[in-house]
Amino acid sequence: MTIMTSPAHRPPASSLSIPHEQAQSAALKGASLAFQKQLDASKKKASPPGPNHNNKLTTDPRGGALVAATSAASLSNQTTGGSSVADHHHGVPEHATLSSRLAQLQQRSGSPHLRPPGNAGGPRSASFIAATLAASRSTSPSPSRKNSVVTPQEQRRRAGAHSRASSVGSLRLTSPSNLGPSPGQGVDYGGYDGEDDADLDHDEDTGFRRLGRRKVVAETPTLPAREQSRRRDGDPVKSPSPVRDTEVPQPRRKVIDRVPEQEEPASPVQKPRPKPKPKPKPKPEKIIKTEPRAAPEPVESKRAEQYPGSEPTSPSIRRASVQQPKPKVARAQPARTPIKAYHSQKEIQVLSRILMPKDVDDIDCGPLTLDGAHGPPFRERVDSISSDDTFFSTSSGQGRRAPTPPPPRRIRSVRETPSRPHSEATTPSSQQRSTSSQSKQTPTSANRSSLALDSLTNAIVASSLASARHTPASRSQTPAPVPVPSRKRNDRLASNLTGGGMSRSHSRSPPKKQGMLTTLRAPHSKSDDEEARKHKERHRKRGPLGGKKHVHHEGSRRRWRDSVTAEERRRYEALWASNRGLLLPPKDGGVGQQHQQQQPEDLVANVVVRDLWSRSRLPHDELAEVWDLVDLGRRGSLSKEEFVVGMWLIDMRLRGRKIPPRVSQSVWDSVKGLRVPAPA
């Protein structure tokens, strides 16, 4: 029958912890007697080396004892693995597992012969278990233990220590590196170095001494039962060879189950492999502070990725790993201190990165003084090397203090915290650890972020208060820009209402009216016409002292001009020169007639005059009236003077004046000018 205890059939923790002292003393005495018997049997008959799955043979003369020890440990782990893992899961100590295992062995019906190790379903005798556990001592790699003669007293002491620690050692295999063979053996366990076996032996020795310091030595009534079972099994213990090959991967499952328990002790100093101190009493204070930081599930997954060879190979182990829940941390047991120091450094860096984002690193880390100015930045000061204990004291001490420190002190402590990742991130070892420990801090970020949020809030409030105290001084030094335009508006409104600021408003008005004036105008003429004079008066009356009373000048205006200005005459003569002689044939005659009559080259035809005058858009009757006034020769064409006077009359009509009934002589004289007769 297979003895597999599950959490449902496991006896309660109280019943297991009662016969603890009795079970340990029974294991001591039974193991010592069985070890003496096993030594006598090993001298007579040596077991042959067994084959290995890796096609390697064991050549060590201690191979028989080693195979027996490993087979017994494998069978013990296979049959009682459920109860041990379940005990750790429910928080039952390891001595309860030891007592429960011995109680189960006493209740079984012993058989006089040893079953083969492949058939783990039947009962086993107590002497076989004690002998095989005691024989595991022979796996030590030290040469002094190979060749030295063992006295009976040393045999009893070693057998008692191994009987107490082997059940614990089945669960407490600290890392996959401890599964390697001894230097004298040729068995390959998956590529691990053989020197790690010395660490396993060293850890077992330290575990034996700690268990021995508990002074749990008492007489037990179960000794006669164990001696009877030993007498019943009269045959010497033989170590079966093929069991090692099939059951070797079994302790690898226990490595994974044991890993979360190693996360408890924290040692700030990193050394290659230091021996644990005999009294680790002052360290559990820091361990209690850092307990919520350990997350068993991410560590287990991380260890599985880091050591791919630690995956179980047998089907029973795989089934147990799927069905069994992940164990919780039962108690703090300092073992493998370099691993924990490695883990604590990762915790420090990831905690600081989770609590303080990148924006906080960009902030100047100088302390905020009461003057509103930042002091020297702390980044230069934090570059000096500081221990990990200082970081734990600043982070965990905030939640432990009852009185709240003053705001500047808390600002300083908070600003030192984000600068910690800068000093640690410079080392290459911390950069390698940060990548593998990102998944550990997810459950602890909420606890730590509350403290950091409180500290950051106090820092922000203090900085805002300090800046608010000094803003009135800066405002008083610089004038406020808002009241200045309001005073200008008030002065402008008052000047418009009272009329006192006329000169100011008057000086600004001309650009507005000048913008509406036409720029394409003829230059100012010297004529005395009404419009030219009005144009002058319009610009003249806008002086610095204002306009005059009688702006229209009713009595001083002139009625009619009776002369053509020289400027107007030049403009009209240019138009005549460009259109003369058009559509007129030349005339032949005597010299006297040519002198008396105008030449056709100096005349402008009536059709051409009509076309030019019609561009003024005056009515045809008015244009006909002007034609009658200027056509003196009645020949159907106009000379130079006639054409100029006709153009002048049309312009006067366009300016608003009426066409006169006759043209005065002064107008004709202004047009003719000085004439020089042609030479004969």
Swiss-Prot record:
Start and end residues of each stretch annotated as Disordered: 1-341, 361-451, 466-563
Keywords per UniProt: Lipid metabolism
Amino acid composition bias (Acidic residues), ranges on this chain: 193-204
Sequence ranges of Basic and acidic residues compositional bias: 227-236, 282-305, 413-423, 525-534
Biased composition (Polar residues): 14-25, 97-110, 311-324
Stored CDD domains: EH
Entry superkingdom: Eukaryota
Pfam families: EH
Domain EH: 568-674
Protein purpose: Positive regulator of phosphatidylinositol 4,5-bisphosphate turnover and negatively regulates signaling through the cell integrity pathway. Involved in rDNA silencing.
Family under the similarity heading: Belongs to the IRS4 family.
Name of protein: Increased rDNA silencing protein 4
Species of origin: Pyricularia oryzae (strain 70-15 / ATCC MYA-4617 / FGSC 8958) (Rice blast fungus)
